[in-house]
């Protein structure tokens, strides 16, 4: 197991210095070249249709303790792409032999994302910045974008809004949301956006709306009412997220299929907020059974009719199916794209 826990540099070699990495340990360039575009017989190239996203809350820790169970889930679901958030550090060898992996990391053991893509699928390009023309990675390794022939796949780990404006977290989140809005307004292909988006859009997306709406840290109340409440459930965040969906013409795949509130399996996060100012025992008890849906698959409206399933894989307040994280995996499956119909032959 030790061989997995080595940071990798941009060329894929182990490195003691932490840095953003775009490594494919199984060989091949960091950013894939042009796809073949077909099978040689005029048919379009096969593209991924089954996706899994998971905030692992440290991939290293999950591999040490919960990996066999998670590996069984992956084997059973057989996703074409696995998107992971909060990896903290890269692994020198991919834990999934049939997948190639791309990493984007922070300079410290914080945040970071990974994207595992089955080797039979060839992305045209992989980027690590919302500005896809930039060669730089996003701060803290929060973005990976894989471009396929007919769509873009975006994996993000959104910054937490935090509790206090004085810590600049509100401003950081506002800037992030502004950049995401600009991105979705200008994408040139249908989009599949997944990851820990750190926001619950509607009251149906949290287990206890009144609790989260009135949540405070050590009694502190932000001066702006729009910033009050649990990070991820403040009026300002929810409003901005709704605008991103509207302006980007995006569909929440899970809510598209699941219209009713599911108190057992309709949430992706459960736990207590982490912070130096929080008394762990008091807050862990207070937050027991309090859950939020903050992990998503959002798809462009052009893809809405292809949604086959979108499921949460965690259940109950005992966090069955969370695999040691405070987030559970979420999956999306699309149907095959309908080939363009052949022109009707004129009748004799």
What do the PLM-derived regions correspond to, one by one?
Residues 51-56, 70-90, 153, 184-204, ...:
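Active-site beta-strand/loop signature of hydrolases that rely on acidic residues for catalysis
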Residues 1-16, 20-27, 126-127, 202-348:
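Metal-dependent phosphoester-hydrolase catalytic domains
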Residues 64-68, 140, 238:
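Structural motif corresponding to alpha-helix initiation and N-cap regions
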Residues 1-95, 100-113, 336-348:
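N-terminal, active-site-proximal structural segment of metallo-dependent hydrolase catalytic domains
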Residues 44, 144-148, 332:
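Short acidic-hydrophobic surface loop/beta-edge motif
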Residues 130-136, 158-180, 225-230:
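Surface-exposed cleft-lining segments at the edges of enzyme active sites
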Residues 86-165:
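Structured beta-strand-rich core segments of catalytic domains in phosphoester-bond hydrolases
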């Amino acid at each position: 197991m030790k061989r997995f826990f080595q940071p990798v540099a941009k060329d894929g070699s182990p490195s003691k210095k932490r840095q953003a990495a775009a490594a494919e340990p199984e060989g091949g360039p960091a950013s894939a070249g042009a796809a073949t575009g077909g099978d040689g017989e005029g048919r379009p190239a096969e593209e991924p249709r089954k996706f899994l996203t998971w905030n692992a809350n440290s991939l290293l820790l999950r591999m040490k303790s919960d990996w066999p169970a998670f590996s069984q889930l992956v084997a059973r679901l057989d996703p074409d792409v696995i998107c992971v958030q909060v990896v903290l550090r890269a692994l020198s060898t991919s834990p999934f032999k049939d997948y190639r992996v791309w990493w984007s990391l922070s300079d410290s053991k914080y945040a970071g994302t990974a994207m595992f893509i089955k080797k039979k699928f060839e992305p045209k390009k992989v980027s690590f910045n919302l500005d896809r023309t930039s060669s730089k990675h996003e701060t803290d390794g929060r973005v990976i974008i894989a471009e396929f022939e007919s769509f873009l796949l975006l994996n993000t780990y959104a910054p937490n809004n935090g509790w206090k404006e004085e810590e600049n977290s509100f401003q950081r989140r506002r800037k992030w949301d502004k950049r995401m809005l600009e991105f979705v307004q200008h994408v040139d292909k249908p989009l599949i956006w997944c990851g820990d988006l750190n926001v619950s859009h509607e009251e149906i997306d949290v287990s206890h709306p009144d609790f989260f709406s009135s949540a405070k840290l050590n009694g502190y109340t932000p001066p702006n009412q729009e910033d009050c409440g649990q990070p991820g459930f403040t009026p300002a965040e929810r409003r901005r997220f709704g605008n991103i969906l509207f302006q980007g013409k995006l569909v929440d795949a899970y809510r598209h299929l699941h219209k009713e509130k599911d108190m057992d399996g309709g949430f992706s996060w459960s736990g207590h907020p982490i912070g130096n100012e929080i008394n762990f025992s008091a807050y862990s008890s207070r937050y027991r059974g309090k859950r939020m849906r903050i992990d998503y698959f959002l798809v462009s409206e052009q893809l809405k009719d292809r949604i086959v399933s979108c499921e949460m894989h965690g259940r109950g307040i005992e966090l069955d199916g969370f695999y040691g994280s405070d987030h559970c995996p979420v999956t999306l499956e699309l149907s095959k794209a309908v080939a363009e119909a052949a022109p009707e032959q004129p009748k004799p």
